[in-house]
Amino acid sequence: MTHAIADSRVPALLDFLSSSPTPWHATASMAQRLEQAGYRRLSETSSWQLAPGERAYVTRNDSSLIAFQLPKGDTSLSSLRMIGAHTDSPCLRLKPNPAQASQGWLTLGVETYGGVLLSTWFDRDLGLAGRVQVRHADGRRETLLLTVMRPFACVPSLAIHLDRDVNSGRAINAQTQMSAVVMQLGEEAGTPAEAFNTLLIELIEEQHGVRVADVVDFELGLYDLQPAAQSGLKGELITSARLDNLLSCFVGLEALLEADGSQGALFVTTDHEEVGSASACGAQGPFLADVLKRINHYVGLDSEEGYQCLVQRSLMISCDNAHAVHPNFADKHDAGHGPKLN
């Protein structure tokens, strides 16, 4: 007999999934959790002073994070147990100049980020989230997180009587068929770009309670407002957007926080996995190596050879998900080697 997932951490997982619509939100949430647990924030642009038993974390681009706990005692660090995950998920990102006018409506052009399952984005209540850089009246610039947690836009389907072949495997063109519909344009709205800029400023001011002179730049995307849930008749399943790979982020962070400090432990989450990881804050970038070298400098064998020894003696588990056998598509897996749910 199957039963509901009884782990007491499920509510925290559901909250993390629902409140982390972008890599920047996920990283901010994990950083807050670490600080609540007593971890010290480090800066890559400042000198570090590390000692045995240290618990600290550092971020890069506000979308990648490394947290570590050094072993207690006076012995030098010889190895680390590491877990790696990624903060990004496939989604629809706004184009740099997204505003368009179509048949009297303000629509926003989108670009696919990662391997997006396009059909699932139609006819949903979509919020808007990401980060924006604003300029204040005094000329000061500031980067802020933006989270619009109400139906901001939708990508409407075409009525079936205008597209009788829609259920016959029609290809979806994200460039021409998936612009997000936001609002009707009145004569007072100005150009589409002006209307969107005004709307964006209003949303920022509403959330942060500040006066904004202008929006300098943004990295924004749409997200499904349906919250994460424990589902199935007996509660056996967790359904949510961004399970790939925020589930692994949550599990990795929990594992680090539960470490007893007897051995070195490290947790790394990187951005841009869905688009190849080839960035300064991606897994192919130098972020992890940079941090390991600095750790080795203070509590390891402070040499290139010592760093190589640390790497070779350590173990990393790379965590990802969304690979389990689908009950309706079991033929997509090797019958003897399909990963099972639960």
Features from the language model and the residues they span:
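N-terminal hydrophobic/helix-forming segments and targeting peptides
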Residues: 1-342
